[in-house]
Amino acid sequence: MKKVLILGGNSDIGIKVIEKLIKDKNLLLSIHYNKFPPKISSKKKINLIKKNLFDINEKNITKIFENDYDIIINLVGYVSDQSFFNFSLKEVNKTILINSIIPYLIIRNSLKNMIKQKFGRIVNTSSVGIKFGGGKKTFAYSLSKYLNEFIPSDIRELASKNIFYNTLRIGVTNTKIHKNIINKSLKSRVRLIPANKLASVDDISNYIIYLIRNNNFITNEIVSITGGE
């Protein structure tokens, strides 16, 4: 039985990943969310963790998150509406803490167990926006996602222990957030994608599932699912 932690599990991608994993009897799922729990219809017992990651610190983290996860997926995506010209240190620090530092801390705390079990699968997430300097109002978010592409050398060395760590650079995806964008603006954005279409939630979730379930060789990689951008 393997223990899975999904951070940011109430996102569209998170819900799709849960739906694909929930029928697996060999997995124990722990789903983190901030405000609203993911809407999943299943009789299977799921450990729901409601917590604003900004309130996590080194003293209380082990009371909220366990330290023996076998699989960790970070889908946290806190966005603050700030550009480079008006960002505040407080908001940038908050965004980086939520999207990057706390997930790294949670990952670090489970590595000892992964080494002992000689198994670990970790998927972090980044954004195609960092390739272009981020959006005009997503400076802090894009900076935090850039940080998520940093793979510590200590983690790189764990490949020999069957602990595989990868970061997905996710392209513009057909989620609720993008559906709320003015249609004309969204069409203009799609035209910038060589594949000339948005990624589907299935596209992204399928890669996540592959990396945690079927992957036996890919590690320490930034995997782009961006339609050619």
Where are these regions (language model features)?
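Substrate-binding pocket helix/loop in short-chain dehydrogenase/reductase
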Residues: S83-F84, E91-N93, H178, R189
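A short, exposed helix-loop element centered on a Lys and neighboring polar residues
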Residues: I107-R108, S153
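Short, small/polar-rich loop/turn modules that mediate ligand/substrate recognition or access, typified
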Residues: A159, F164, I218-E221
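N-terminal Rossmann NAD(P)H-binding glycine-rich loop of SDR-like oxidoreductase domains
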Residues: N10, G14-I18
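Conserved NAD(P)H cofactor-binding loop of Rossmann-fold oxidoreductase domains
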Residues: L75-D81, G228
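Catalytic loop of short-chain dehydrogenase/reductase
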Residues: R121-A159, V172
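C-terminal substrate-recognition "lid" of short-chain dehydrogenase/reductases
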Residues: F119, L198-I225
